[in-house]
Amino acid sequence: SYSMEHFRWGKPVGKKRRPVKVYPNGAEDESAEAFPLEF
């Protein structure tokens, strides 16, 4: 499910995912995948 969202929010959410990684939650997994998309 997040696959399609990544492509859609990969750019706008990419910036918000960076700070989200600070959370000890599973957000790190989401931010880690958003990084390669932007990089």
UniProtKB/Swiss-Prot annotation:
Keywords in alphabetical order: Acetylation, Amidation, Cleavage on pair of basic residues, Hormone, Phosphoprotein, Secreted
InterPro entries: Mcrtin_ACTH_cent, PMOC, POMC-derived_peptides
Coiled coil: none
Gene Ontology BP term (one): regulation of corticosterone secretion
Domain of life the protein comes from: Eukaryota
PTM sites of type Valine amide: 13
Entry's localization field: Secreted
UniProt GO cellular component terms: extracellular space; secretory granule
Gene Ontology molecular function terms on file: G protein-coupled receptor binding; hormone activity
Modified residues (N-acetylserine): 1
Main location: secreted
Phosphoserine found at: 31
Function: Precursor protein for pituitary hormones that regulate stress and environmental adaptation.
Family label: Belongs to the POMC family.
Protein name: Pro-opiomelanocortin
Organism of derivation: Balaenoptera borealis
